Amino acid sequence: MVMTQRIAVLGATGSIGDSTLAILAAQPQHYDVYALSGYHRLDKLLALCQQFAPKRVGVPTAAVDEFAKRLSEAGLDIEVVGGETGLVDIATDSQTDTVVAAIVGAAGLPSTLAAARAGKRILLANKEALVMAGQVMINAVKTHHATLLPLDSEHNAIFQCLPFAIQQDNTQIHRLNHGVRKLWLTASGGPFLQQSFTQMQQASVAEAVKHPNWSMGQKISVDSATMMNKGLELIEACHLFDLPENKINVVIHPQSIIHSMVEYSDGSFLAQLGSPDMKTPIAHALSYPDRIDSGSQPLDLFALSGLEFIEPDLQKFACLRLAREAMQTGTHATIILNAANEIAVSAFLNNQIRLTDIADINEQALNEIQVSALTETADIDEILAIDNLARQHTEKLVARLV
């Protein structure tokens, strides 16, 4: 690793941003923080600008003037850009080498797709880019010779366990000589693994966001509690590794030590192990194909008391079943599922519905919303139109329960 990479961290104020910037701060000889973006936590974004002095920063359109004023008062000469247009501009900037796509939800799709079309090196934490626009995204990566490296611990683990030829070209996974039989995504089971469905019905927001192993944002923590997070990761894995959903298994592994596995035709299982710390996959992707110090606590094998593997209960965790069904149906269904889930999770976080209502609302949305299937050449406007329709319909479903 000789050249300094210029990094744009989109979603810098979230948990992925925290972990990424901790690594970048410790490796100034390798990385230059060229651009940052944030949405809600602008005080934190200002502090990050003071720490890293990026050349550009993205904020909501309505906040551009005020944020520029605050930067000026702090003695910082940083260009401020606003809204989706600003994020796309940062992602496609000729000075940007690597885009860390860490914006949560559908809001991260346009800038991530733009980065792919600009041939950038993309470190992907935004699941929705593949859940909503999987084949479109993969086609853009290949057509424009971009590089796509997964930051999710599970997908990063699988990536590390695959032969180099498949890492370079996911269609190589079908070659018999590589012998890939199945992929195994591990799941923690979330905070309600040992509780009944009835207990889940009574769960508070505070209980749902208290993940047993990982430190994450509220939305992804709720998704972990319902196992929708694993459902979205299943869809993401299908696109990343060019496999149908029936070639990807999900297993609950409460200790979160094995981050995922690849099963080979000779009976071998290759697994990636590590402490449950997002800095490990982020450091891998930042430095790939080299390795750097992530700053994470090394795994102490002597402290491990045992590793468990449990089959998911698809009645209790219906969101996982819905994700498989949506993947079988097509991209239009995965867009609907993702949009419905975002609205339902928001309603739960606002104490409008129960945790277990999320799966019911998601299933209703899938059953009730009728749209045409998308082709592989669908554009972003078609994708966002289905997303918008699904959100509007789901808002009505939530209103019936409030």
Curated annotation (Swiss-Prot):
Q: What is its EC number?
A: 1.1.1.267
This enzyme catalyses: 2-C-methyl-D-erythritol 4-phosphate + NADP(+) = 1-deoxy-D-xylulose 5-phosphate + NADPH + H(+)
Annotated positions binding Mn(2+): D152, E154, E233
Q: Offer an example of a GO molecular function term for this protein.
A: NADPH binding
Q: Which residues take part in binding NADPH?
A: T13, G14, S15, I16, N126, E128, G217
Annotated metabolic or biological route of this protein: Isoprenoid biosynthesis; isopentenyl diphosphate biosynthesis via DXP pathway; isopentenyl diphosphate from 1-deoxy-D-xylulose 5-phosphate: step 1/6
**Gene Ontology terms describing biological process:** isopentenyl diphosphate biosynthetic process, methylerythritol 4-phosphate pathway involved in terpenoid biosynthetic process
Keywords, ordered alphabetically: Isoprene biosynthesis, Manganese, Metal-binding, NADP, Oxidoreductase
Pfam families reported in the protein's UniProt record: DXP_redisom_C, DXP_reductoisom, DXPR_C
Q: Which cofactor does it need?
A: Mg(2+); Mn(2+)
Q: Which PANTHER family match?
A: 1-DEOXY-D-XYLULOSE 5-PHOSPHATE REDUCTOISOMERASE, 1-DEOXY-D-XYLULOSE 5-PHOSPHATE REDUCTOISOMERASE, CHLOROPLASTIC
This molecule's function is given as:
Catalyzes the NADPH-dependent rearrangement and reduction of 1-deoxy-D-xylulose-5-phosphate (DXP) to 2-C-methyl-D-erythritol 4-phosphate (MEP).
This protein is called: 1-deoxy-D-xylulose 5-phosphate reductoisomerase
Write the gene name: dxr
